Design a protein with these regions (language model features):
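Low-complexity, Ser/Thr/Pro/Gly-enriched N-terminal "stalk/linker" regions
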Residues: 1-106, 131-151
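Hydrophobic core segments within long, regular secondary-structure runs in both alpha-
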Residues: 19, 26, 38, 111, ...
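Solvent-exposed loop and edge beta-strand segments that line ligand/cofactor-binding
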Residues: 3, 70, 89-107, 158-171, ...
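Catalytic-core region of carbohydrate-active enzymes that cleave or remodel glycosidic bonds
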Residues: 305-326, 349-401, 412
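A conserved hydrophobic secondary-structure block that centers on an alpha-helix together
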Residues: 154-232
Length: 669
């Protein structure tokens, strides 16, 4: 593993986004999504599923206050731990925990989004709200560092007795990520100290050694959270704990058997749902719950980089290749089945029952960025870009007030309402979810999108994503002008002199067949792994100009993807397109796209959004008096009529009411 290839993300404080596209999304999160979600966390959104999140923190704080006051005389009122979700009965609540057992993370993801927003746009009132909420959270923490309201409220004697199912280490992970981000944004360490104390508690209870359990997370995220804590503090113990979780995972005897009193017959492998069916370095196929998987792989990449573990990196590369070449949707969505919110078998990518959870695409972005930190390869950045513009942004309405958990590639509303096999596919975005992992996850990702655009090392500034703004690296400052994702022209101006040769490395998008470049005189130019490296002693004001033409592309799938045979998907630049009923009428399944016909891309403004609409020649089968026709009849050539198909960006679908939608369209010559 060559450390010369390593790079690290720039601090968000060193990147200012002025980009027309992403600045708008970030402002939407700041002005609409963050306040809306704060109301949701406090159960103040009419018609939305309750969160109970802040109520649980306050209730846990009351329990801790009573425990401290009574000391040895404290006797906890205990409640059952046998439900994944607890709801009030007949609208009446008692002192128990309510919601999903991981409900704490609604807040910790929200506060992470707040932190990133404050970095770009200081807001004293928002910071005050976050500070007060942090006090409520920290008031619930035990003196020994434990902080998970599900057990603090219900039964503290049962802590760490069901790591597989009950998400304690998942809650720790999101607490830590939020705490690190908030400290970096504000300099305030109240939540950070709480996260460190919780991490120390975990290290004292889990691992190898007398009195410890050889356990590891059921839902991964603690691994990459510990690595963020390690990167911030330099404390070796956090790297050691992350490495332990990864190394121990999937070893036999299975810890999950031990903690639940089960045995595993010789030769049997299970727990693939948790990516714990075998040691991670022996895994060669992405399996199980898709979000858990990419969170684990992100942590593995972090540990591989920090420890220069070649075997772990090789595993990451193997799993990456299986995922993006055999199990990823054209939108950057992952996880094909609602059963277990999981990956299916290779090339099984159904469109109308797709799961493609918003959180899973976000996790894919995390994984891609971490692989880029080890070595800049355009494939990683291409997938990161694909997921961000499509599989991630589709999870949020244009007004920021409703959300998709699941992101299908084909929707017939009647089927969503009447076919139980598609109960998970919603034809309209929801105000909130009882299991609300996706909305705050999306908010924190959009707020921090600049951290995925650039990485740097001692010699090079890497530009992975193109967005307008300013960048202040350790050795160079630059301003970037970009109209992505609608136009491929990019200019990068050096805003400082360099005393020594320095390199800018620009990703050459995989969707671009050829590109144009205008390079200052005297520069050394090299292409490597899909990046254009430009090296020279820079003078302030020197500019690099690039143009990546965005042609309308009709994509075909691998022939082993059964559902997409004979169909095409439309893509322009990084943006995937879809047909909607609002533009093309009902019965979209009767339409065909003429791949050799005329096609146009035109700027449009609708629903407050500037975008590029694609129009293509098509044909539509005449429906006739179909309801009076026999169910089956002898084949005869279909009667068709010419039509113009109008397509919009996939992330924009379902912002004009309920209706049909298709990404993959039947093709004709």
């Amino acid at each position: 593993m060559d450390q010369k290839n390593f790079s690290k993300p720039l601090s968000l404080a060193k990147v200012q986004v002025t980009d027309a596209f992403w600045k708008k999304e970030m402002e939407l999160v700041r002005t609409e999504v963050i306040p809306y979600q704060w109301n949701a966390l406090n159960d103040n959104v009419p018609g939305a599923a309750p969160s109970f999140c802040m109520r649980n923190y306050r209730r846990a704080g009351e329990v801790e206050k009573e425990r401290k006051a009574k000391g040895d005389k404290f006797v906890q009122i205990k409640y059952p731990l046998d439900t994944f979700e607890t709801l009030p009965k007949d609208g009446k609540m008692d002192g128990r925990f309510y919601g999903f057992l991981f409900q704490d993370t609604d807040f910790t993801k929200w506060v992470e989004a707040v932190a990133y927003s404050l970095t770009q746009h200081p807001d004293p009132e928002l910071e005050k709200t976050a500070d007060e909420a942090i006090e409520a959270v920290c008031a619930a923490q035990r003196e020994d560092g434990y902080l998970d309201t599900y057990y603090l409220i219900n039964d503290q004697d049962m802590i760490f007795t069901n790591l597989k199912d009950n998400h304690e280490l998942y809650c720790f992970g999101h607490l830590t990520e939020g705490a690190v981000a908030y400290y970096q944004a504000t300099g305030k360490d109240r939540l950070l100290k709480a996260a460190e104390r919780f991490a120390d508690f975990i290290a004292s209870k889990l691992g190898h050694g007398e009195g410890k359990k050889a356990g590891y997370p059921g839902h991964e995220i603690a691994e990459m959270a510990l690595m963020r804590l390690y990167d911030l503090t330099g404390e070796q113990k956090y790297l050691d704990l992350a490495k332990y979780f990864i190394d121990e995972r999937g070893t036999k005897p299975y810890y999950y058997d031990i903690e639940r009193g089960l045995t595993c017959p010789e030769g049997e492998e299970r727990y693939s749902y948790n990516q714990a069916n075998r040691p991670v370095r022996q895994q060669d196929e992405v399996q199980g719950h898709s979000v858990r998987a990419v969170y684990l792989y992100s942590g593995m990449a972090d540990v591989a980089r920090a420890t220069q573990d070649e075997s772990l990196l090789k595993t990451c590369e193997t799993l990456w290749n299986n995922m993006v070449h055999q199990k990823m949707y054209v939108t950057g969505g992952i996880g094909a089945t609602h059963i277990g919110e999981a990956f299916s078998f290779n090339y099984d990518l159904p469109n109308d029952t797709a799961y493609a959870e918003t959180c899973a695409s976000i996790g894919l972005v995390f994984f891609a960025r971490r692989m880029l930190e080890i070595q800049a390869k355009a494939e990683y950045a291409d997938v990161m870009e694909l997921a961000l513009y499509n599989g991630v942004l589709s999870g949020m309405a244009l007004d920021g007030k409703s959300f998709f958990y699941v992101n299908p590639l084909e929707v017939l509303p009647e089927a969503c309402h009447k076919d139980e096999r598609k109960f998970h596919v919603k034809p309209i975005r929801q105000k909130w979810f009882g299991c609300a992992c996706c909305p705050p996850n999306l908010a924190r990702t959009v707020s921090s999108v600049a951290s995925y655009a650039y990485t740097e090392n001692d010699t090079t500034l890497f530009v992975h994503l193109y967005m307008g703004g300013t960048v202040e690296g350790e050795k160079v400052k630059a301003s970037i002008t970009s109209e992505f994702p609608w136009d491929g022209h990019v200019s990068v101006t050096c805003e400082s002199d360099t005393k020594e040769p320095y390199t800018f490395a620009f990703r050459i998008p995989g969707w671009c067949a050829s590109y144009e470049k205008e390079i200052p005189k005297g520069a050394e130019v090299e292409e490597k792994d899909g990046y254009l490296y430009v090296t020279k002693v820079w003078a302030k004001g020197e500019t690099i100009r690039l143009n990546f033409p965005m042609e309308i592309q009709f994509l075909a799938s691998n022939p082993l993807i059964r559902e997409d045979a004979g169909r095409v998907a439309v893509k322009r630049g990084p943006v995937v397109y879809c047909m909607e009923e609002a533009d093309n009428g009902k019965n979209l399944h009767l339409t065909k796209l003429c791949v050799n016909g005329e096609k146009t891309a035109e700027a449009a403004d609708e629903l407050g959004e500037h975008f590029v609409r694609v129009t293509a020649e098509g044909r539509r089968m005449k429906l006739g008096d179909a309801e009076k026709q026999p169910l089956y009849h002898l084949y005869q050539k279909e009667e068709e009529e010419k039509t113009k198909l109008k397509l919009i960006p996939y992330y924009m679908w379902n912002n004009r009411g309920e209706g049909e939608m298709q990404v993959w369209i039947r093709a004709c010559e």
